[in-house]
């Protein structure tokens, strides 16, 4: 089944009101989340931009009879304080109160993992949702950086290394593995850490 855009929502009340299970994609602004989503769908549905902070709504997509949600990016410095707070509140509410949600795909930049990413992992762990950390832009790292990053990422984020996958939306590296692991999030309840 081909992927398609369903709707955008600015708050939980505007989200689809049904019982279809969902997996959401979240990540810092400018980590290549939209490009990764498009690679996952094999179709350009999520809007990509060189300007960080473009996604400020919850964007719902349907693919293979499953629902996926592109969440606004967090941590973009050029947003106003009010905008940052609104996005933080929306993300927190969605993770904690969206009953359809069965899993979270946290997209990070392979080369720049932040304390903010670490805090988001803590928040995800507190929800009890199953999750997967996708380290995108792996193609931008040299061989030495790849080795060190793979060893440090799970330790820094305090998660099981099996929860971390290195990919490149640009080159297609590990996208088939990612595809399979994301669909597994619909089956699992809770996470092993």
UniProtKB/Swiss-Prot annotation:
Q: Output a single Gene Ontology CC term carried by this record.
A: cytosol
Query: Is NADP found in the keyword set?
Result: no
List, alphabetically, the PROSITE patterns matched: G_ENGB
| Coiled coil region boundaries | none
User: Transmembrane residues, as ranges?
Assistant: none
Q: Where does Mg(2+) bind?
A: 34, 55
Q: What does this protein do?
A: Necessary for normal cell division and for the maintenance of normal septation.
Protein name per UniProt: Probable GTP-binding protein EngB
Species source reads Mycoplasma pneumoniae (strain ATCC 29342 / M129 / Subtype 1)
Q: Which gene encodes it?
A: engB
